[in-house]
């Protein structure tokens, strides 16, 4: 009998077969599922604590997506040869999984939950993130942990006017959209997308298509739960003390209503702290014991109800705006004097100082991803220090939120970047959030676009971003334009859209409730477009087009194309030539395999000098052309003349002068600069030169030249086959003491009479006796 009670379910999903298994691996986890999609295999596990920690006032859910290099048949390239801290891709995938499952845990469930996903095998054409989302959904569903799932997920492409389910990395090169959607059977919960300036209708169609396809996976998970599901936990939300709730409400409601009439964030935040502290003090004075965490939850619920009811009844929002108004915008370009490009973008109480730096191809980020190595020439980094929200905090390593916001801004801008051929720079954009009250990632998009244009990046269009919110109660709903931080926390949807006047380039949705219909999303997209056009107008007023020249402090890139066969001449043995060029010219030189050479320098004259030197190195000698160069070597039969860097030609003794030349050194010396004419080149590339072709023959001089003494390096056919040593006859007699061999480094001495060759037919030496 087997140790395992394995349950397997498979289903056809587009052109792929999906297999889900449980009961064999990781049996001590609360739930564990292995998902295999055409060779991409993931293990999803979930473990939950049976009880919440005392005083716990938030839901402690942690999602860790981990890629193992053995999944792609690789060994880690680090010094320790093992997987280290999470890569950016792993962090983003962890967030992608977290976002749709978090709202499905019940209110009041504060037990610690840890979700871990391992990628065990990877087919580069099947993304592991979708398999991971399905695996996590299945693991949670069979675990018995309180969870209102399952969820399904799908990736959607848009190729040749058609939606494509789960396109691989090859197919995505032709896709105008890369969209991931996740949700339950009834509702979409999460959307993450980038696109090539597509319309709102096409984007919404992609969301609907993806949701329909995700339901196929949900149905299969239901079948797995029926056969392998564990008993559902007997968990109930803590019963509310109605009398205590009423007491807190009576103490706090009027104070909180007054707080939310204050329009300034800082003043409102301070008043809110004072109101909450007043309630706490009153409760303490009453002598009745209470849980401070529970009181804070009740106060937040009262705040939420006040703000939501005001908005749904048509009253002004927290800062006094109506639902469609964008906060005041101010833009300043070229803020920093010595950076390559900069912009200060302020929208209400949200502000980003965004800086662009231009670099060479060597500055591109080389990423050793599981699916294969690639080079990233566009980097976007987002930072938000604690002072941006008026708080005290620690400055440490980059947080998951910062990585996610930077990735969203990058998605929004990448569609309008110039090609490498149009603009061969590596671009790094850094958004420093100096104030935050909602939608700082979209401020980063706007500031990033303006900063790059200030740096001289020829953007195809301006890109603006806007964050939308939603308040929904029963059949009433209100879509909010340009949400504040408080509206984000108190609302039901965070909906970010970025794009140009032509269409959407990035879309991100996080929905906290079920029941968001297609019609509501249509209204939200239409309202977002209206706001986007308003912001684009402000940006175009501030900076109509990109600067035509890059900053004087940025490297100037000069490109030229050479014959790929000449690349080795430019690099030289062991890189000696290119290193020497860079040291000589003070430039940075990069060579592509196709022969494209990029020269980077902040000094245009140095770049031009380097270009000329490369042209000299790679130039071909032209027949009939006159060159001037130094004598590099004197030979018995002529001299070698340097014509171009690394290219010498032979000036034969017969081509030095019209008169007979007995000794080359009578006319030439090493280092002497002479003018020569190219007579011809042979099939091996050897060049023959002439000095006398540049002068006229003196009148009356007879034509009597020595026959040419050619270089005997290639002696050609010597008349018949050479005999083997064993066929050379009897060499006769005692050879005596053998003369020392000729040393090629010593000067060769003329032969003595005794060393003259023997007459033909005679053998001067006998073969050595083998018994000597």
From Swiss-Prot:
Its cofactor is Mg(2+). GO terms for biological process: mRNA catabolic process; RNA processing. It comes from the Bacteria. Residues 555-614 form the KH domain. It catalyses: RNA(n+1) + phosphate = RNA(n) + a ribonucleoside 5'-diphosphate. Involved in mRNA degradation. Catalyzes the phosphorolysis of single-stranded polyribonucleotides processively in the 3'- to 5'-direction. Belongs to the polyribonucleotide nucleotidyltransferase family. This is Polyribonucleotide nucleotidyltransferase. It comes from Variovorax paradoxus (strain S110).
């Amino acid at each position: 009998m087997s140790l395992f009670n394995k349950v397997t379910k498979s289903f056809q999903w587009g052109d792929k077969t999906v297999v889900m298994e449980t009961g064999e691996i990781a049996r001590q986890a609360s739930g564990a599922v292995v998902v295999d999609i055409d060779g991409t295999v993931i293990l999803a596990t979930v473990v939950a604590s049976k009880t919440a920690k005392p005083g716990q006032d938030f839901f402690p859910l942690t999602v860790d997506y981990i890629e193992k290099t053995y999944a792609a048949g690789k060994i880690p390239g680090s010094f320790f040869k093992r997987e280290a801290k999470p890569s950016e891709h792993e962090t983003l995938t962890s967030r992608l999984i977290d976002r749709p499952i978090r709202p499905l845990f019940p209110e009041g469930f504060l037990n610690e939950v840890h979700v871990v996903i391992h990628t065990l095998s990877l087919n580069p054409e099947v993304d592991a993130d979708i398999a991971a989302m399905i695996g996590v959904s299945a693991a949670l569903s069979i675990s018995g942990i309180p969870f209102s799932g399952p969820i399904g997920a799908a990736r959607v492409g848009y190729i040749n006017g058609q939606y494509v389910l789960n396109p691989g990395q090859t197919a995505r090169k032709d896709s105008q959209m890369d969209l991931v959607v996740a949700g339950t059977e009834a509702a979409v919960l999460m959307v993450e997308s980038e696109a090539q300036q597509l319309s709102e209708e096409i984007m919404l169609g992609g969301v609907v298509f993806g949701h329909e396809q995700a339901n196929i996976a949900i149905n299969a998970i239901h079948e797995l739960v029926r056969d392998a599901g564990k008993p559902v936990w007997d968990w109930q939300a803590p019963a509310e003390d109605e009398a205590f709730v009423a007491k807190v409400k009576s103490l706090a409601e009027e104070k909180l209503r007054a707080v939310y009439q204050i329009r300034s964030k800082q003043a409102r935040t301070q008043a809110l702290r004072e109101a909450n502290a007043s309630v706490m003090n009153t409760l303490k004075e009453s002598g009745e014991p209470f849980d401070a965490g529970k009181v804070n939850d009740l106060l937040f619920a009262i705040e939420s109800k006040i703000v939501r009811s005001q908005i749904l009844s048509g009253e002004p929002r927290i800062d006094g705006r109506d639902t469609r108004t964008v906060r005041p915008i101010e833009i300043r370009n070229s803020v920093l004097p010595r950076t390559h490009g900069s912009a200060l973008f302020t929208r209400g109480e949200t502000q980003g100082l965004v800086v662009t730096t231009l670099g060479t191809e060597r500055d591109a980020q080389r990423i050793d991803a599981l699916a294969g190595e690639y080079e990233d020439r566009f980097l976007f980094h987002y930072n938000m220090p604690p002072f941006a929200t008026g708080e005290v905090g620690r400055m440490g390593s980059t947080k998951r939120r910062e990585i996610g916001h930077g990735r969203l801004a990058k998605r929004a801008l990448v569609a309008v970047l110039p090609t490498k051929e149009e603009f061969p720079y590596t671009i790094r954009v850094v958004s420093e959030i100096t104030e935050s009250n909602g939608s700082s990632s979209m401020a980063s998009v706007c500031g990033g676009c303006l900063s790059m244009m200030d740096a001289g990046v020829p953007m195809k269009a301006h890109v603006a971003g806007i964050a939308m919110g939603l308040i929904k109660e029963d059949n009433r709903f209100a879509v909010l334009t340009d949400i504040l931080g408080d509206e984000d926390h108190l609302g039901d949807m965070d909906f970010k859209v970025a794009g140009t006047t032509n269409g959407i380039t990035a879309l991100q949705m996080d929905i906290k409730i079920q029941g968001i219909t297609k019609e509501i999303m249509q209204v939200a997209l239409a309202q977002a477009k209206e706001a986007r056009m308003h912001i684009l107008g402000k940006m175009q007023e501030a900076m109509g087009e990109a600067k035509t020249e890059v900053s004087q402090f940025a490297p100037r890139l000069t490109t030229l194309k050479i014959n790929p066969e000449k690349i080795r001449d430019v690099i030289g043995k062991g890189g000696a030539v290119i290193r020497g060029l860079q040291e000589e010219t003070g430039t940075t030189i990069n060579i592509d395999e196709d022969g494209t050479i990029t020269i980077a320098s902040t000094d245009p004259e140095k770049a031009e000098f380097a270009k000329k030197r490369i042209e000299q190195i790679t130039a071909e000698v032209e027949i009939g052309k006159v060159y001037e160069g130094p004598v590099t070597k004197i030979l018995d039969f002529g001299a070698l003349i340097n014509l171009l860097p690394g290219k010498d030609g032979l000036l034969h003794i017969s081509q030095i002068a019209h008169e007979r030349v007995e000794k080359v050194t009578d006319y030439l010396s090493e280092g002497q600069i002479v003018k020569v004419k190219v007579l011809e080149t042979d099939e091996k590339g050897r060049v023959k030169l002439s000095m006398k072709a540049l002068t006229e023959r003196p009148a009356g001089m007879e034509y009597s030249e020595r026959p040419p003494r050619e270089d005997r390096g290639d002696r050609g056919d010597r008349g018949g086959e050479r005999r083997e040593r064993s066929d050379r006859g009897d060499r006769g007699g005692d050879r005596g003491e053998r003369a020392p061999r000729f040393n090629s480094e010593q000067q060769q001495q003329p032969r003595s009479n005794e060393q003259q060759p023997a007459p033909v037919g005679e053998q001067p030496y006998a073969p050595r006796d083998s018994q000597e």
